[in-house]
Each structure stands twice: as structure tokens, then as C-alpha cells.
């Protein structure tokens, strides 16, 4: 028996895998916003904060220090965690905030400075001797920011600042931030879901089915189907398991889950090949054999290994894509201290510096591997798509101003710079942002349509046939894109598709029943969607139509926009356009550059559901489309109002 990667488990289960326990302090998220704030705003869902920290107590002044400098005005924040109450009883609680704040304890609002006087509100609350969840939301317009939480304990004669000993936060949090202005709205905002914010719930053309047993809570790292219709999933958790899911289409509706293997190190890809399940774990492809046919793997055969796989929490091995006689997987870069480093453990064991952040090609018969493409950061999602080509997602970070979907080709370079120095520690001066990168198929503006894109899959039937779906771990839901090839380069448009799922989406797979199976995942901190961390569901197409943009394709003089249904009166004024570009930098993420807002210069109706828009075109720019005052011929509002087209090439007339 070849143990292979199972020996890695104790040392390589990364820090991002779900931990339990508490640490001292209150967790604080802060979003940079613009415009005048005179009431408590709501930050649009799906946007990561600009600043993320754990503070000892709520006595905060003058703003917050962040990656982009100090944030002093026009921001929205949230402090949350648990209050550790040592003495039960009746407490007086006082909240001070310039400009406004609310405090909820145990899910009930107890303080609101906007209904108090002089930026202060106080109230009485009965607190039990236990850990009590709290959520403190605040905002700052201009002036000197001040936020303070005080209490008067039973028997005290006056208020005092709630001490550090009374605050608890989740231990082992993953701190995910991003730069730039974040979107917000007020209760009086008339914009609908799907217009400047995520769509509301499940797509109208699909039915959501939750079929997992209630006590089965998988954090799914990979998913595939066996020839007999059963599903195999691997889990990114402390078990490191492979499960077989049976009865997916039984008339009784009783789904059964059986453990097939365990002890794998961060399994994040799985495929059924040559009669066995093959799994990608950290630093290895492992073939799982059930020689005695008892329903459990008894042989773990290392098929391929040897690429860097350090203990670094961010050095993953993702995916397992069979293509002909080759296998393809992706590796991410390790992170440390705010910079990206190549640091494969305590010794320089691997002489190849460009393997982290690469697509690897593996000979299936020999296990020999080589670098197929590189310049990636966190390529958590790869699959076969349009024209049978491979596409891979990548996540915003250093050198990636926002997330993107890339066309995978031999020798491709996708932008992430990694240049080790003589001691294997790259220095900022050695990182060369001028190194040209292959353009993405689509840029995915952060917090607007995606934060952490995952696995793409080709759609083979239904209204979106020929397009691609892809999931998202922290923005949540599934998005879609139409792709076209212009002058030999792939490019296209990204659209919001669905929300309403039980967790952020890590893996997608079409079942033999023609349903889309959805694997959820999540971890500590804000590396999750709405604090949900597991999920297994599926979407079934109902045949019902929903009014929305079906596709956007470029023309020599503009774009052709096609809808799923005939439209009512339509013209150039129904489209608000914004164009912008991105540029790499060594810091996390990046702003939109050269932003212009405009209306199309002309419009021509091509069919009852298609229009051609005329406008100036600039290669290397993203074009955002926003529908305004547009309804279908039946009087229906759009399901989603926005789309983003990445223009790499302009077709010849």
C-alpha cells in the first residue's frame, strides 16, 4: 500500500481550515464609501471591507489605518463578536458615536445614537453570565470620528468603558480586505436587487433542491460523478475525506452518504478515471483503490508529486481536469507578511521558482509533470468550456487589481509577479510589473459581481447553452458569462445569475440528471458567504423564462445586446455606460482607472430582442452596461440590470 499524501495531513492542513475557539477583542470591518452620510447606510452585500482588525475594546478615535492610508471620513463600519459577562444582572449601557451607531445584543437592537441626543444613546439591558453575541454598526461622515461603548455594571456608581476582558472574537480568522470605494444605499433607495447589488434569491428559471442529509455538512473541495450516477465529493476540512453520495434520483428521496476515504491533505480536486477515483491533494495526485470491494479505499497510490507544497496556509493545489492523456491542476502562491513569497518550508527543497501560481500538465501514465502556464495567484477553479478549451478563475490580490477568468494556453502568463531573490525571498524591487500579461477573458469588478471566483462549467442546454457558469466563495451565488473569440483572443461579458444558496460556491458539476450540482464552502473570518460554511445543493431548469440580458457581443462600432425575451420600446437612453481599465500593482487589488460615464451615441433595433449600440471602443477597457427604465414586452422588469464586457480586441469591419 502506498500512503502518498496522507502522511502530509498533520502538517499541511492549513490555517484557513475551520477552527474553533475564541480570542480576545472585538472584530472590526470598515468600508470606504463616498457621498454625504446623514443616516445609517447599508453596505451592498458581497463587498469585502477596506480595513479588517481586532481591537481590544470599543474606544476608537480619529479613524482607521489601512493599506491605502488612514481612513478618517465617509466610512461605514461594523464591530462584532461576543460580550463575556462575568456578573449577571441589570446593566446600564451607553453608546457614543460621531456620527451614528446602533448596538444589537443577542439579535435585539438596544441602542441607536440617531434617536438619542448629542450622538449618545443609553439603555438598560439584562445580561446573563455567559458569552453574548453583539453587533455594533456605525458610520462617519466628516469631522473627528469617535466611537465608545460603556457600561455601568450592577453595583457600580458610574459608567466605565467596557474593558478588553469583556470582548471575544472568533479565533483563527482569515482577514480578507480590498481597496477602493464601496457601494452603499439607504432605505429610500429605489434601486432593485440586481441593480448595483446582488440579485434576490434563486434564478426564476431554475428550481433549487437541497437533498443532503441534515447531519451531513460538507465543505466541498471537489465533486464528480461515477458512471452509475452516484456522486463523489472530497472535503476541505480536518477529515480530508472522500464521500460517495447515493440515491440522488431515488423515488424515495432518501439520499445516503458513505465515507470512502479519509486522511487526505486539503483535497481540492477529484475525477473518476480508469475505474477509480483520483484526488488532488496538497502536493500530490492520489489514486484511490478499493481492492477488496468493501466500499472503502484501501490503497492510496501517489500518481504524481514533487511540486512545492509548503506548510504555508495559502499554498494550495487546486482542481483535477482530465484532457486526453493529460491531467491538469493549478497551484497557488504562498503568502507571508503582506507580500507574496516563495517559501517551500524550512529548506529550499524545490529548485523551480515558478511552480507556485502555475497550471501543471501531468502525464497520466507516468506522473511526469511540467509547468503549462503561470502568473496565477489563487486559481481556485478550472474546467473545460467554450470550444473545449480550458478556463481558470483567479482571485484579486497582489498584481491582480480584481478577480478574472483566464483562457488557459501553453506558455500563458496571467499577471502575478514572482521573482525570488538569492535567499528565495523576493524583494519588491525584483518584482517587475511591466512584464506583459495575457488579458483575461473577463475582468470581474470586486464586490460588484465577484470576490472569490471558483470553478467554471460549460452550459450544454437551456437558454444559456454555450455560455459558462462559475461560482463564488465570498460574493456567493453563481455568475455566468458569454464568451467569443475576436482576432484569436477570447473575451466576453459577465452577468449576475443566481443567489439564494446555502453557502458560498466552490465547485460546480453537471449531473447525469442534467441538474447543476453545487458544492459549498467557507472558513473563518470573512472568507465565506454570510457566515455559511458548508453546502450541497442542485439547480434544475424549469423551462420558465426570465427577462434579462442574454448576451453581449462586440461589433466594429459598438456592441450587440441580446435579451432573453422581446423588449418594449428601447433606445440608447436605456443604457447607462461606464468604461474603465485596470493596471497591476504590488499591493492587494487595485482601483478602476480612466473611468468614463456616457450614453451610447446611437442604437439600431436588430430584432424584437436584440439591439446594436454605437459607441467609441478602446481595447483593454471594461464596459459596464446598466439598464435604465427598460421592461420586456410583457411588462416585466429585468432579473439583473448590469453586465461587464472585457474588450481585448475590436473586430475588423
Model-inferred region functions:
Residues 1-12:
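Bacterial N-terminal signal peptides that target proteins for export
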Residues 10-20:
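Bacterial N-terminal signal peptides
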Residues 561-602, 625-633, 641-645:
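Short, surface-exposed alpha-helix to beta-strand junction/turn motifs within ectodomains of secreted
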Amino acid at each position: 500500500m502506498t500512503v502518498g499524501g496522507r502522511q502530509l495531513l498533520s502538517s499541511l492542513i492549513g490555517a484557513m481550515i475551520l477552527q474553533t475557539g475564541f480570542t480576545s477583542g472585538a472584530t472590526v470591518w470598515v468600508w470606504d464609501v463616498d457621498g454625504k452620510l446623514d443616516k445609517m447606510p447599508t453596505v451592498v452585500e458581497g463587498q469585502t471591507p477596506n480595513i479588517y482588525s481586532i481591537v481590544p475594546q470599543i474606544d476608537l478615535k480619529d479613524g482607521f489605518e489601512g493599506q491605502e492610508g488612514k481612513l478618517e471620513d465617509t466610512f461605514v463600519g461594523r464591530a462584532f463578536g461576543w460580550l463575556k459577562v462575568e456578573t449577571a444582572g441589570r446593566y446600564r449601557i451607553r453608546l457614543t458615536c460621531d456620527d451614528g451607531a446602533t448596538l444589537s445584543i443577542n439579535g435585539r437592537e438596544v441602542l441607536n445614537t440617531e434617536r438619542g441626543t448629542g450622538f449618545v444613546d443609553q439603555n438598560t439591558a439584562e445580561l446573563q453570565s455567559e458569552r453574548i453575541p453583539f453587533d455594533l454598526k456605525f458610520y462617519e461622515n466628516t469631522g473627528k470620528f469617535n466611537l465608545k461603548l460603556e457600561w455601568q455594571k450592577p453595583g457600580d456608581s458610574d459608567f466605565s468603558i467596557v474593558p478588553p476582558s469583556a470582548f471575544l472574537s472568533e479565533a483563527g480568522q482569515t482577514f480578507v480586505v480590498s481597496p477602493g470605494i464601496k457601494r452603499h444605499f439607504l432605505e429610500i433607495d429605489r434601486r432593485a436587487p440586481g441593480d448595483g447589488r446582488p440579485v434576490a434569491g434563486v434564478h426564476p428559471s431554475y428550481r433549487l433542491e437541497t437533498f443532503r442529509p441534515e447531519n451531513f455538512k460538507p465543505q466541498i473541495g471537489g465533486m464528480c460523478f461515477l458512471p452509475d450516477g452516484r456522486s463523489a465529493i472530497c472535503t476541505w476540512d480536518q477529515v480530508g475525506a472522500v464521500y460517495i453520495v447515493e440515491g440522488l434520483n431515488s423515488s424515495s428521496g432518501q439520499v445516503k452518504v458513505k465515507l470512502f476515504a479519509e486522511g487526505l491533505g486539503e483535497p481540492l480536486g477529484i475525477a473518476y478515471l480508469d475505474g477509480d477515483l483520483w484526488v488532488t491533494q496538497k502536493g500530490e495526485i492520489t489514486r484511490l483503490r478499493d481492492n477488496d470491494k468493501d466500499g472503502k479505499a484501501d490503497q492510496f497510490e501517489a500518481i504524481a508529486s514533487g511540486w512545492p507544497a509548503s506548510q504555508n496556509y495559502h499554498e494550495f493545489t487546486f482542481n483535477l481536469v482530465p484532457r486526453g492523456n493529460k491531467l491538469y491542476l493549478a497551484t497557488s502562491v504562498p503568502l507571508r507578511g503582506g507580500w507574496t513569497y516563495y517559501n517551500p518550508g524550512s529548506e529550499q527543497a524545490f529548485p523551480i521558482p515558478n511552480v507556485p501560481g502555475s497550471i501543471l500538465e501531468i502525464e497520466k501514465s507516468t506522473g511526469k509533470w511540467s509547468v503549462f502556464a503561470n502568473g496565477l495567484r489563487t486559481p481556485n477553479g478550472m474546467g473545460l468550456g467554450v470550444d473545449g478549451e480550458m478556463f481558470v478563475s483567479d482571485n484579486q490580490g497582489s498584481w491582480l487589481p480584481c478577480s478574472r477568468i483566464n483562457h488557459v494556453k501553453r506558455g500563458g502568463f496571467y499577471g502575478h509577479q514572482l521573482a525570488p531573490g538569492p535567499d528565495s525571498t523576493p524583494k519588491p524591487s525584483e518584482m517587475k510589473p511591466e512584464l506583459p500579461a495575457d488579458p483575461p477573458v473577463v475582468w470581474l469588478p470586486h464586490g460588484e459581481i465577484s470576490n472569490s471566483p471558483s470553478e467554471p462549467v460549460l452550459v450544454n442546454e437551456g437558454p444559456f447553452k454555450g455560455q459558462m457558469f462559475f461560482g463564488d466563495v465570498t460574493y456567493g451565488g453563481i455568475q455566468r458569462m458569454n464568451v467569443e473569440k475576436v482576432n484569436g483572443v477570447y473575451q466576453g461579458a459577465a452577468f449576475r445569475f443566481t443567489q439564494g444558496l446555502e453557502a458560498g460556491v466552490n465547485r460546480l458539476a453537471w449531473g447525469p440528471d442534467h441538474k447543476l450540482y453545487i458544492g459549498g464552502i467557507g472558513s473563518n473570518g470573512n472568507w465565506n458567504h454570510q457566515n455559511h460554511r458548508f453546502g450541497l445543493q442542485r439547480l434544475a431548469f424549469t423551462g420558465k423564462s426570465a427577462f434579462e440580458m442574454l448576451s453581449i457581443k462586440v461589433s466594429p462600432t459598438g456592441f450587440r445586446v441580446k435579451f432573453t425575451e422581446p423588449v418594449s420600446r428601447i433606445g440608447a437612453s436605456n443604457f447607462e455606460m461606464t468604461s474603465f481599465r485596470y493596471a497591476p500593482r504590488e499591493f492587494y487589488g487595485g482601483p478602476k482607472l480612466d473611468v468614463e460615464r456616457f450614453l451610447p451615441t446611437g442604437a439600431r433595433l436588430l430584432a424584437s430582442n436584440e439591439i446594436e449600440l454605437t459607441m467609441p471602443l478602446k481595447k483593454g477597457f471594461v464596459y459596464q452596461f446598466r439598464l435604465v427604465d427598460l421592461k420586456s414586452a410583457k411588462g416585466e422588469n429585468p432579473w439583473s440590470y448590469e453586465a461587464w464586457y472585457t474588450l481585448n480586441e475590436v473586430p475588423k469591419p
